[in-house]
Design a protein with these regions (language model features):
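Conserved glycine-rich Rossmann-like NAD(P)H-binding loop of the short-chain dehydrogenase/reductase
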Residues: 27-41
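Conserved glycine-rich cofactor-binding loop
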Residues: 11-12
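Active-site helix of classical SDR
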Residues: 120, 155
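The beta1-alpha1 cofactor-binding region of Rossmann-like NAD(H)/NADP(H)-dependent oxidoreductases
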Residues: 37, 58-69, 102
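Residue(s) in the substrate-gating loop at a strand-loop-helix junction
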Residues: 139
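Substrate-binding pocket helix/loop in short-chain dehydrogenase/reductase
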Residues: 95-97, 101-107
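C-terminal helical subdomain
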Residues: 179-180, 199-245
Length: 252
């Protein structure tokens, strides 16, 4: 019987790369996202390429009602979840605290923090029953702040704290909890942050080789593939040319 992985925010970037990676190891995949057409395309691609089954759930993780309805209405055969990857997240803007946009703050906190909590809480009865593995997508920005990172950093510090709390509170159920903290990864992240400004987005990765979504997916799969008695609590992963949130060695 195939194992099942649930991946939030799976229509692009790290989430999509995780779906591909786990599918290649014969997992059946539950993918969620806001773009229904993208979910359908990915479902078809993965099922045809790997001969596995894919369930798509279209919702915005900010919407608690939709999250709980979608998860509670999943077919029974999809509820035996082995791995949950809380990947949905984003950054909007890179402005000083005094110049930041309140709507951007709300979207980041509701997506990065509330969304993770809603998905985890909705799935928790199933996760407890199956002694599942929860993998939360943090960030190096959740370990160390940087200039004009303010609320994005705050949201990822919260993910780190939530992961630590989960690890303690859910230990009695045999649930593993892992937090993954990437540095610079070349995905849609910067394009979203800079609201479609490709010049600004591309400049983030100039002068060095950033991580790829596949690098992170490989790492996540490794943590999920370890024996039941082994839990990697957290991993911080950066490009070789990145030493911290703000220090890079770039060829300019």
């Amino acid at each position: 019987m195939n194992k099942i992985v649930f991946i939030s925010g799976a229509t692009s970037g790290i989430g999509k790369a995780c779906a591909e990676k786990f599918a290649s190891f014969n997992y059946n995949i539950i993918i969620t996202g806001r773009r229904e057409e993208r979910l359908s395309v990915i479902k078809t691609e993965l099922e045809n390429k790997y001969n596995i089954n894919v369930l798509t759930l279209c919702f915005d993780v900010q919407d608690r009602k939709l999250v709980f309805e979608a998860i509670q209405n999943m077919p029974e055969e999809w509820k035996a979840i082995d791995v949950l990857i809380n990947n949905a997240g984003l950054s909007l803007g890179r402005d000083s605290f005094d110049d930041s946009n309140l709507d951007d703050w709300d979207t980041m906190m509701h997506t990065n923090v509330d969304g993770l909590l809603y998905v985890s809480k909705a799935l928790l009865p199933n996760l407890i029953t199956h002694k599942s593995h929860i993998i939360n997508m943090g960030s190096i920005a959740g370990k160390e702040i940087y200039e004009n990172g303010n609320i994005y950093c705050a949201s990822k510090f919260a993910v780190d704290a939530i992961s630590r709390s989960m690890r303690v509170d859910l230990l009695k159920y045999g649930i593993k909890v892992t937090a993954i903290h990437p540095g610079a990864v070349d995905t849609e992240f910067s394009l979203v942050r800079y609201k479609g400004d490709k010049t600004k987005a591309d400049s983030v990765y100039k002068g060095f080789t950033p991580l790829s979504a596949e690098d992170i997916a490989d790492t996540i799969y490794y943590t999920a593939s370890l024996p039941k008695h082994v839990c990697i609590n957290e991993l911080t992963i950066t490009p070789t040319r990145q030493a911290s949130t703000y220090y890079f060695h770039k060829d300019l």
